[in-house]
């Protein structure tokens, strides 16, 4: 390049004489198998004679720096099929950079709450990640029961009784190309995070998201490609709102960035939720629909429906709520510039939240898996 001269010197050690030997610039660097501690200096000179001093670290030094960087994190245990084991050292909770989930987004994930020593809706979330993996054409590294056993054991090793279990299925490490054909094998990762499951029943404001919604083929897969979701959330926060609401091209309400939505209409007697055809099928949302039948039995609600909901109808609803495993139900009192109902938290959202919390604490074995600590 005209006007720019490069002078790279990498000081390595000769194994016999321990004298420094210059290594010319190539496409990569070849290091001796045994090295003493050293500092590599990469000199890049141009008209301004700039230089940088970048240390080359031993594996021990890398580990020590990672421990400092991870200080205070509540990461209690991680499983990686790459090493086929569980670690409780946060500094060791790393992924290969050549994993296609990292550099190509070819991976899917899911989560399950840990509540009082039980995994809530583990089977439902596990079924969903397996569907997502199939749609993303990611082969399974293990069968379903083995994956479930690994997830439960990871929580058991962590000792966490209240927190979150997150897990991923990836095309796996192999190279930095687009196709996964050279990936060694698909991978499973899982991590246990200690969190405070705080319930906030205070109503929030939402806004209509201007970020393009994912097409159904991708919206129905819980993949790691969350850039639209992140941008939607950032847009909402910049407008002083809790979340953004996506609307499909036909004008029907879709979902939030990581939650479903529901409405109470017809004088507070009907619970309606947008169809799941073009959005991610929410496990907590589906469980809420099941629990809502108890309100029908008590005469509090007349019907529970899954149907198309227009923005106009949604904004005219008596109540609106967001539903997701981390919330789990949050009332919405304002959408854009319009108040929902009376502009305050409604009774149905509270009743559904109470039912869901009771289900999390003492629900049937179909939704609660005991962790053997």
From Swiss-Prot:
The modification N6-(pyridoxal phosphate)lysine is found at residue 222. InterPro entries: Aminotrans_IV, Aminotransferase-like, BCAT-like_C, BCAT-like_N, Class-IV_PLP-Dep_Aminotrnsfr. The active site is at 222 (proton acceptor). Its main location: plastid. Its EC number is 2.6.1.21, 4.1.3.38. It catalyses: D-alanine + 2-oxoglutarate = D-glutamate + pyruvate; 4-amino-4-deoxychorismate = 4-aminobenzoate + pyruvate + H(+). Inhibited by hydroxylamine or amino-oxyacetic acid. Its cofactor is pyridoxal 5'-phosphate. Pyridoxal 5'-phosphate binds at residues 128, 255. Keywords: Aminotransferase, Chloroplast, Lyase, Plastid, Pyridoxal phosphate, Transferase, Transit peptide. GO terms for cellular component: chloroplast; chloroplast stroma. This is D-amino-acid transaminase, chloroplastic. The gene is DAAT.
């Amino acid at each position: 390049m005209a006007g720019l001269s490069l002078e790279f010197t990498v000081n390595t050690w000769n194994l016999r004489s321990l004298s420094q030997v210059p290594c010319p610039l190539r496409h990569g660097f070849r290091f001796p198998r045994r090295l003493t501690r050293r500092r590599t200096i990469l000199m890049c000179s141009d008209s301004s004679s700039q230089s940088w001093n970048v240390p080359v670290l031993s594996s021990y030094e890398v580990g020590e720096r990672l421990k400092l960087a991870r200080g205070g994190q509540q990461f209690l245990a991680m499983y990686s099929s790459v090493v086929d084991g569980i670690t409780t050292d946060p500094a060791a909770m790393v992924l290969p950079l050549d994993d296609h989930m990292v550099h190509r987004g070819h991976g899917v994930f899911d989560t399950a709450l840990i509540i009082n020593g039980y995994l809530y809706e583990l089977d439902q979330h596990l079924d969903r990640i397996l569907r997502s993996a199939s749609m993303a054409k990611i082969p399974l590294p293990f069968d379903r029961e083995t994956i479930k056993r690994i997830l439960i054991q990871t929580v058991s090793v962590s000792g966490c009784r209240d927190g979150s279990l997150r897990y991923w299925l990836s095309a796996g490490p192999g190279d930095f190309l687009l196709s996964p054909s050279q990936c060694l094998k698909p991978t499973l990762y899982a991590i246990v995070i200690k969190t405070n499951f705080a319930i906030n029943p205070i109503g929030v404001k939402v806004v209509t998201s201007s970020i393009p919604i994912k097409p159904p083929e991708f919206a129905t897969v819980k993949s790691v490609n969350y850039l639209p979701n992140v941008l939607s959330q950032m847009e909402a926060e910049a407008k002083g709102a809790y979340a953004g609401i996506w609307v499909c091209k036909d004008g029907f309400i879709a979902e939030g960035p990581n939650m479903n939505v529901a409405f109470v209409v017809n004088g507070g007697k009907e619970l309606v939720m947008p169809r799941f055809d073009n959005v991610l099928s929410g496990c907590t949302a589906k469980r809420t629909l099941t629990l809502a039948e108890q309100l029908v039995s008590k005469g509090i609600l007349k019907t529970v429906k899954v149907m198309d909901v227009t923005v106009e109808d949604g904004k005219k609803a008596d109540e609106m709520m967001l539903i997701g495993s981390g919330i789990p139900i949050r009332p919405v009192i304002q959408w854009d510039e319009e108040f929902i109902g009376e502009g305050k938290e409604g009774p149905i959202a509270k009743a559904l939240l109470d039912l869901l919390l009771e289900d999390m604490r003492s629900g049937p074995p179909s939704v609660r898996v005991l962790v053997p600590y």
